[in-house]
């Protein structure tokens, strides 16, 4: 009999999940191809490093910001970020703690939540990094991966939905205008919209 994972065990399941990472990387690659500028957030430094190594092929520039770097190194990385030309495609990979108050890079228009978070303030803070005026920015999109097979993360997702609704976000269709489906019991249309109705 298998047991339901909790705590660090639950995070380990998604942190070291190649299929899940492949899904995220495919979405990031499509995002860059569509001319968007994504930031991918994860809770773990090793996860950020692993994803950044595999994602660098998809953009002209990839910049990794993690809490493992000293202050001097982080300043150099921020300088590198600010030096990226508008004509260059860019992927920013970071640990969530580094995108707190004071971080400002208006070009970002797409957020990838590579590990689950909960708490209205955290969601508002992360999404707030995208809500900056920038020439040519038409909208902002959040990719939120629903780990519904793990009860802990399913509850966290429900909490995030409430936060998204509070700050005015809507359920999104894919970039080609079609509802995106997943090979699971619920696709994004039925699963998320059911939650959305529950919040009304």
Feature roles, as predicted:
Residues 30-33, 56, 82-87, 103-105:
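Conserved catalytic network of the ASCE P-loop NTPase/AAA+ motor domain
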Residues 110, 117-142, 160-161:
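Conserved SF2 helicase motif VI
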Residues 1-54:
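Conserved interdomain hinge at the start of the Helicase C-terminal
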Residues 39, 49-50, 59-100, 122:
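Conserved helicase ATPase core of P-loop NTP-dependent helicases/translocases
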Residues 92-94, 100-116, 125, 141-144:
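A short beta-strand element within the Helicase C-terminal
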Residues 45-47, 70, 98-100, 116-120, ...:
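Conserved nucleotide-binding/hydrolysis micro-motifs of P-loop NTPases
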Residues 3, 9, 134-199:
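C-terminal helicase lobe
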């Amino acid at each position: 009999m298998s047991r339901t994972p909790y705590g660090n065990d639950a995070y380990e399941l998604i942190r070291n999940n190649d299929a899940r990472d492949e899904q995220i990387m495919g979405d990031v690659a499509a995002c860059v191809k569509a001319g968007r500028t994504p930031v991918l957030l994860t809770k773990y430094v090793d996860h950020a490093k692993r994803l950044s190594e595999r994602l660098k092929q998809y953009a002209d520039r990839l910049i990794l910001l993690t809490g493992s770097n000293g202050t001097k190194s982080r300043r150099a990385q921020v300088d590198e970020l600010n030096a990226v030309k508008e004509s260059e495609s860019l992927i920013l990979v970071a640990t969530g703690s580094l995108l707190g108050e004071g971080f400002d890079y208006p070009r970002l228009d797409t957020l990838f939540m590579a590990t689950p978070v909960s708490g209205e303030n955290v969601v508002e803070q992360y999404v707030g990094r995208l809500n900056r005026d920038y020439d040519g920015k038409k909208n902002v999109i959040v990719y939120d991966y629903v780990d519904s097979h793990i009860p802990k993360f399913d509850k966290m997702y429900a909490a995030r939905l409430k936060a998204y609704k509070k700050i005015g976000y809507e359920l999104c269709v894919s970039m080609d205008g079609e509802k995106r489906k997943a090979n699971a019991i619920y696709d994004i249309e039925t699963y998320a919209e059911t939650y959305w109705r529950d919040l009304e």
